[in-house]
C-alpha cells in the first residue's frame, strides 16, 4: 500500500509561508533570469495565468491584477523540501523521494491498525503544522493508482479534504470512469491521442483493455501501467535514488558575455558547483567537459557553440582539479567577438568513494589533504550559506550572474535573512 504526498503549488507556497500578507492573493514564481511562469498558486490559476507565460509580456497585466511575482529562490525551496521529507520519514517506515515536492510512503501494515484516510489526514496535518505547507495525499495499492488518488485529492480538495483512499475497488472504478486517459501518470500527449483514436478515452477504458492488445500496439511500459491500474504492483518503492551517471551545471547568463575573463569566472563557478554536487553524491569523476554557446535566436548575429573535454587518469572530487580541467577546456573553444548566452560544465565517468584507484603515471596525483580541505569548505558553505567560501577564479562582482530581480530572502538558511519579530 502506497501513499503519494505532494505539496500543493510548492514553489509559490514556499514564498507565502513567510509572507502572511500574501495569503489569498495571486502569487507566481518565475524561471531562471525571470523568464516565464513556472509555478502559480490557486488564486493565480483562477485569473487564467498559465505555466510558461513570459514575464515581459504579462508584467503589465500582472500589475493590474495584483499578481505578486518572485524570482526562483532555489535555496529556500530545497530547505523547505528537506523539512517536508524529514517529516514524512518520521511518519512512514520507508519513503521514496520522487521529486522536490512529492514522495511515496510505504503504508504496509498500516491498514491493519489504522483507517487509511485518518492516517492520510494525520500526514497532512503534521506536515502543515511543521512547515505551513499543504500536501495532497493519495492512497492506493500501486504507485500509479496512488498518483491517480493524489490527483483527485488536489482536484476536488473541498470535497475530499485533500486525502483520497483508493484501496476500495468500487471507488477506484468510479474515479477512473470520471477521468480522461491523459490524467494517468506517464501517459503523454502522443500516447493519449493514439489511445483516443482507438476508443480508449477514460482511465477506466484503459484499465479494462486487454493486456495482449496493449502489448501488441504499444510497449511494456504501458502494459505495466495498465497492470498497476488493475491493482497489480509493478513499481516497487525505491528508498535510494539510483547513482547519477553525470552531473551538469549550466545557466543562461543574466547579460550576454563578450569578454574572456567574465566567461572564465562563470566556468570556474559552474565547475565549483558541479564538484560540490559530486562530493554530495560520494563520487569521483574522470571526465570534465565545458560548453559555451550564443543564442540561436539572436537576429543578425552568427551562431557559435562548441564544447571540449578533459579525461583525467586518476578520478578526483577536488574542486581545484575540476576547475583546472574545465578552464583548460574553455581555452580550447573560446572565440572572441561573440555574445555568449549560455555555458556549462559536465562531469562524467564516475567512481564510487573508496573504489577509485590511483595511477602511477598521472602527473596530477591527489593533493595532500584534499579530502579534508573539501570537507571543511563544504561544511562552512552548508552552515553559513553557499558562496561563503569560494575560489578567487569565480570572481567577486559577477555581472553575468542569473537575473533574479524579485528574489525573496533565504529565510531558513541565511542568518542575515531571518525574520524579525517586533
From Swiss-Prot:
GO MF annotation: an example: damaged DNA binding
UmuC domain residues: 2-188
Keywords: DNA damage, DNA repair, SOS mutagenesis, SOS response
GO cellular component, one term: plasma membrane
Factors inducing expression: Repressed by LexA, induced by DNA damage. Induced 1.5-fold by hydroxyurea.
Protein purpose: Involved in UV protection and mutation. Poorly processive, error-prone DNA polymerase involved in translesion repair. Essential for induced (or SOS) mutagenesis. Able to replicate DNA across DNA lesions (thymine photodimers and abasic sites, translesion synthesis) in the presence of activated RecA; efficiency is maximal in the presence of the beta sliding-clamp and clamp-loading complex of DNA polymerase III plus single-stranded binding protein (SSB). RecA and to a lesser extent the beta clamp-complex may target Pol V to replication complexes stalled at DNA template lesions.
Protein family membership: Belongs to the DNA polymerase type-Y family.
NCBIfam families: PRK03609.1
Protein name, UniProt field: Protein UmuC
Gene that encodes the chain: umuC
Amino acid at each position: 500500500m502506497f501513499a503519494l504526498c505532494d505539496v500543493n503549488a510548492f514553489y509559490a507556497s514556499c514564498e507565502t509561508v513567510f509572507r502572511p500578507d500574501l495569503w489569498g492573493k495571486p502569487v507566481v514564481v518565475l524561471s531562471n533570469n525571470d523568464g516565464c511562469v513556472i509555478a502559480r498558486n490557486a488564486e493565480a490559476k483562477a485569473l487564467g495565468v498559465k505555466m510558461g507565460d513570459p514575464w515581459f509580456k504579462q508584467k503589465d497585466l500582472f500589475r493590474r491584477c495584483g499578481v505578486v511575482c518572485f524570482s526562483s529562490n532555489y535555496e529556500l525551496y530545497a530547505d523547505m523540501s528537506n523539512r517536508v521529507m524529514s517529516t514524512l520519514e518520521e511518519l512512514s517506515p520507508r519513503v521514496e523521494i520522487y521529486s522536490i515536492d512529492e514522495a511515496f510512503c510505504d503504508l504496509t501494515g498500516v491498514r491493519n491498525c489504522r483507517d487509511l484516510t485518518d492516517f492520510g489526514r494525520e500526514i497532512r496535518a503534521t506536515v502543515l503544522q511543521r512547515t505551513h505547507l499543504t500536501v495532497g495525499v493519495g492512497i492506493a495499492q500501486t504507485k500509479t493508482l496512488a498518483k491517480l488518488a493524489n490527483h483527485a485529492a488536489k482536484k476536488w480538495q473541498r470535497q475530499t479534504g485533500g486525502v483520497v483512499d483508493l484501496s476500495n475497488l468500487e471507488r477506484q472504478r468510479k474515479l477512473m470512469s470520471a477521468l480522461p486517459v491523459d490524467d494517468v501518470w506517464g501517459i503523454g500527449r502522443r500516447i493519449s491521442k493514439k489511445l483516443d483514436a482507438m476508443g480508449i478515452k477514460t482511465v477506466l477504458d484503459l484499465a479494462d483493455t486487454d493486456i495482449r492488445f496493449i502489448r501488441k500496439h504499444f510497449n511494456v511500459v504501458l502494459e505495466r501501467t495498465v497492470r498497476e491500474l488493475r491493482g497489480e504492483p509493478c513499481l516497487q518503492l525505491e528508498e535510494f535514488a539510483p547513482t547519477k551517471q553525470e552531473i551538469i551545471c549550466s545557466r543562461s547568463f543574466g547579460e550576454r558575455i563578450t569578454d574572456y575573463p567574465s566567461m572564465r569566472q562563470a566556468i570556474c563557478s559552474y565547475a565549483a558547483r558541479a564538484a560540490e554536487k559530486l562530493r554530495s553524491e560520494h563520487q569521483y569523476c574522470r571526465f570534465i567537459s565545458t560548453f559555451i554557446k550564443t543564442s540561436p535566436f539572436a537576429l543578425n548575429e552568427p551562431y557559435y557553440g562548441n564544447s571540449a573535454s578533459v579525461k583525467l587518469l586518476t578520478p578526483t572530487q577536488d574542486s581545484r582539479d575540476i576547475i583546472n580541467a574545465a578552464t583548460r577546456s574553455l581555452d580550447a573553444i573560446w572565440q572572441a567577438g561573440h555574445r555568449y548566452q549560455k555555458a556549462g560544465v559536465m562531469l562524467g565517468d564516475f567512481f564510487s568513494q573508496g573504489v577509485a584507484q590511483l595511477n602511477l603515471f598521472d602527473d596530477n596525483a591527489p593533493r595532500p589533504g584534499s579530502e579534508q580541505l573539501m570537507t571543511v569548505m563544504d561544511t562552512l558553505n552548508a552552515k553559513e550559506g553557499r558562496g561563503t567560501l569560494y575560489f578567487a577564479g569565480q570572481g567577486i562582482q559577477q555581472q553575468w550572474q542569473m537575473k533574479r530581480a524579485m528574489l525573496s530572502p533565504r529565510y531558513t538558511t541565511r542568518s542575515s535573512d531571518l525574520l524579525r519579530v517586533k
